[in-house]
């Protein structure tokens, strides 16, 4: 790659990665986009509500079959089981808990090889959306935010809403009901769809081309110096960390691709808006890439990774688990996230590590903010905060230090998502030996740094 001239490099990049990636991406999603738009137009016709719900069920079923063929039966079975439990518990005040337990048992049975591992993991995205919607609806019914148990066609319409069933994101039952009302088409709506779709394709290109093309082209200047380094240990350590960062960035952009694509499909189908005085603001946001790549803190990374899911975990898991204590609630929240994403050792290890990293970072920065009276909390302070030091050089330096530490943690955690691993291994999940090997190569650095931060927090307490 380093022997290419600049013109040859960009020509190879265009023909070997950019164009094929965009073409394959559009080939995969054009039918889903068409179905979303067709449903959007259908709901503008003023049909009876039950026909609107039935149409989105039909669109959702067709989309599932297009992507997963007959494997979609496992998603259908989960949705039927959820409505059965909801109907049987319709007079209970703990419907959210009953639905959560039912879904937990179902997902655990699937993870324990009731179904072929590769098949099960292919379905986990759609299963996750169905599970999140069912649980949120149960708790909203318990809290009185939804007045009555939906009819079967309303319930299935919500779960199989064509704009979210394949790629997400999670939306509330209220947002779904607003979507099927068939709001007017507008320039703002079309602009939002086009922007989200363009960003999705850009992130897909970056995710696919970072490893084989972009990263090796831009890094060699530093890499050549490393290769001339007489100290092999230092050279090897730096190369391993660069590879870890490469894997992390590629994984990040694959997540942004799904996030922006889910924005496009949900908005195209009519969801994801807020009502202003004289117009609708199409403002659905799933991911904030800049907050992840240039973070203030790991807490900001976690919330910006997937905003709807972060809201769901906070509102329906963390708040309900707070009675167990803050740290226990954090662990329960990350455990729920691991189960929803498809329980595998490497994912559980990443999420458990994230739980400790974010908790230690939060309490340490909170303690330092109190001692120094400075705006160095994990989240940005409000304009009327009581801290004496807000924008000074020392405050900026500390925030930059914690931001650099967050990038360090992200590189370490992202090293598990190796861009060179074959698809079958990725679908089955990485085992314990692989996880231990990858983190051993990096000397377990992130865990040791987190432990050191916790010791420091205890010492200054």
Curated annotation (Swiss-Prot):
The EC number(s) attached to this protein equal 2.3.1.250
What subcellular compartments does it reside in?
Endoplasmic reticulum membrane
Could you say what the effect of mutating residue 306 to A is? Does not affect acyltransferase activity
Tissue expression profile of the protein: Expressed in brain, heart, kidney, liver, lung, muscle, spleen and testis. Isoform 4 is strongly expressed in kidney, liver, lung, spleen and testis. Isoform 1 is strongly expressed in brain, heart and muscle and poorly in kidney, liver, lung, spleen and testis.
UniProt name for this protein: Protein-serine O-palmitoleoyltransferase porcupine
User: Record's Pfam families?
Assistant: MBOAT
Q: Which UniProt keywords apply?
A: Acyltransferase, Endoplasmic reticulum, Membrane, Transferase, Transmembrane, Transmembrane helix, Wnt signaling pathway
Task: Indicate the impact reported for residue 334 to A.
Answer: Impaired acyltransferase activity. Impaired ability to interact with WNT3A
| Quaternary structure, from the entry | Interacts with WNT1, WNT3, WNT3A, WNT4, WNT5A, WNT5B, WNT6, WNT7A and WNT7B.
Q: Which GO terms describe its molecular function?
A: O-acyltransferase activity; palmitoleoyltransferase activity; Wnt-protein binding
Parts of the chain that traverse the membrane? 18-38, 67-87, 96-116, 153-173, 199-219, 253-273, 338-358, 397-417
Q: What is its main location?
A: endoplasmic reticulum
The record places the active site at 341
Output the InterPro entries linked to this UniProt entry.
LPLAT_7/PORCN-like, MBOAT_fam
Residue spans, topological domain Cytoplasmic:
1-17, 88-95, 174-198, 274-337, 418-461
The job of this chain, per UniProt, is described as:
Protein-serine O-palmitoleoyltransferase that acts as a key regulator of the Wnt signaling pathway by mediating the attachment of palmitoleate, a 16-carbon monounsaturated fatty acid (C16:1(9Z)), to Wnt proteins. Serine palmitoleoylation of WNT proteins is required for efficient binding to frizzled receptors.
Q: What effect on the protein does mutating residue 305 to A have, as reported in its record?
A: Impaired acyltransferase activity
The record gives the effect of mutating residue 228 to C as: Does not affect acyltransferase activity
The terms describing its cellular component in GO are:
AMPA glutamate receptor complex; endoplasmic reticulum; endoplasmic reticulum membrane; glutamatergic synapse
Which BP terms does GO give this entry? Answer: glycoprotein metabolic process; protein lipidation; protein palmitoleylation; regulation of postsynaptic membrane neurotransmitter receptor levels; Wnt signaling pathway
Q: Top enzyme class of this protein?
A: transferase
Designated gene of the protein: Porcn
Which residues are on the Extracellular side of the membrane? 39-66, 117-152, 220-252, 359-396
Tell me what topology the record assigns in the membrane: Multi-pass membrane protein
Q: Which family does it belong to?
A: Belongs to the membrane-bound acyltransferase family. Porcupine subfamily.
Organism of this sequence: Mus musculus (Mouse)
